[in-house]
Amino acid sequence: GSEKEADMGPLVTRAHRDRIAGLIDSGEAAGAKVVIDGRTVEARGAADGFWLGPTLFDNVTPDMEIYTEEIFGPVLSVVRVSSYAEGVELINANAYGNGTAVFTNDGGAARRFEKDVQVGMIGVNVPVPVPVAYYSFGGWKRSLFGDTHAHGTEGVHFFTRGKVVTTRWIDPANRPTDGLQLGFPRNV
C-alpha cells in the first residue's frame, strides 16, 4: 500500500483476507501449482493490516474450490484446455460470469471469443479485464449483484434521479380569446 511504487493496498477486512488465504490453501492442497505465493507478503510499518500479495496458480481444474468460488482478491488461476471450443464451454458452464481473458495474436479469434463467452467483462491480451470507470463494471449470471452494474450509464442512472419537465409558454400576443386552452397544441 502506502509506498509510491505499490500497485495494491490491503484487503478491506481480516475476515476477507482470511477467506482468500484459505482459498489459496485449498488450491495448493488440491494440487494446483502455486507459481507466485502472496501469503508471505509483509508490509513494513503496517503489520496489523490485512495484507495479501498477488497469487498465481497454474494447472487449476474446474473441480477445485479456487475455480468454483468467486474469490474477489489478488488471485489468478490458469486453467488449461486443449481447444478453443473446450475453453468457451468451460467459461460458459461456470455459474459466475464476471470476467475472463484471452491472449492471442489473432484478431479474428479475439472477436469470436468476445461473442462466444457469457461474461460481463472480457480482456483481450489483458490479464484482469477491469475497465475505466465510465464503462460498465460487472459480470453476468451469479457475478451480478442487484440489477445494475457499478459504473457506466447503469451506475449513473442508479445514482441519479431523473426528472421530466413539460412546459408550454404562450406568446401573449397570440393568447386565445376564448379562454384557457389545456389540450394538446394544434397547428391551425
Feature annotation, model-predicted:
Residues 8, 24, 29, 44-188:
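Conserved C-terminal structural/oligomerization subdomain of aldehyde/semialdehyde dehydrogenase
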Residues 10-21:
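Short beta-strand to alpha-helix junction loop
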Residues 31-40:
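Short secondary-structure junctions
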